[in-house]
């Protein structure tokens, strides 16, 4: 073999080794990255599942309690009893910004599009409901809180024993508070199902 041919052969072999080494390093890097992503995804989904399970339990209890309270109030009004009006106070542990934080922490890259869609659906509906609850609370602060010591005649027409016009939304506010938790429970159950499907898929 000519010296030039030997040099070309040696150079080709060295180049091939370099290529194989680079490819192996790339493959190992890629494998390690996929493994890390899988671990992060599993931790993220496990944490999310735990939070959602807790939310479902709380939402169910509150929906039941608020629904009963609203029905009892409506029944008393219908019976002409003129029950007292209390300040409307709406409390929920849900914070829509938690979803944004989750997505910024890598959720967008790691989670299945269907899981992300379920998360965003919960966030969107909750924001709409919270806006309504905020309006009810403002009305309560303006109309009920300053007059909480007033007698029933202030809130009801004594002749008809029906709520005066400016207080007519009060029973609806109680009912809507219960409906919020009913829908929240339903949406969280759908989200939980999707989380479990994704965890099963990546086992």
Whereabouts are the PLM-identified features?
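Short hydrophobic membrane-inserting helices
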Residues: 1-13
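Interfacial alpha-helical end/capping and short helix-turn segments at domain and membrane boundaries
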Residues: 1-2, 50-203
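Transmembrane signal-anchor/signal-peptide helices with a preference for the extracytoplasmic
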Residues: 19-43
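Membrane-proximal amphipathic alpha-helices
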Residues: 34-45, 55-63
């Amino acid at each position: 073999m000519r010296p030039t041919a030997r040099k070309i052969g040696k150079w080709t072999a060295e180049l091939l080794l370099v290529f194989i080494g680079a490819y192996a390093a790339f493959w190992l890097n890629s494998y390690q990255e996929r493994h890390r992503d899988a671990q992060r995804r599993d931790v993220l989904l496990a944490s999310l599942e735990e939070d959602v399970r807790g939310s479902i339990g709380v939402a169910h209890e509150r929906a039941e309690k608020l629904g009963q309270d609203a029905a009892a109030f409506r029944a008393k009004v219908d019976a002409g009893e003129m029950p007292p009006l209390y300040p409307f106070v709406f409390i929920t542990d849900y914070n829509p910004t938690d979803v944004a934080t989750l997505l910024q922490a890598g959720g967008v890259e790691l989670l299945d599009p269907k899981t992300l869609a379920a998360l965003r659906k919960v966030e969107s509906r909750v924001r709409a409901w919270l806006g309504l609850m905020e309006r009810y609370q403002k009305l309560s602060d303006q109309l009920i809180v300053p007059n909480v010591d007033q007698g029933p005649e202030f809130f009801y027409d004594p002749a008809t024993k029906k709520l005066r016009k400016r207080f007519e939304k009060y029973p609806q506010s109680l009912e809507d508070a219960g409906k919020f938790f009913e829908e929240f429970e339903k949406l969280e159950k759908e989200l939980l199902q999707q989380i479990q499907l994704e965890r099963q898929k990546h086992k």
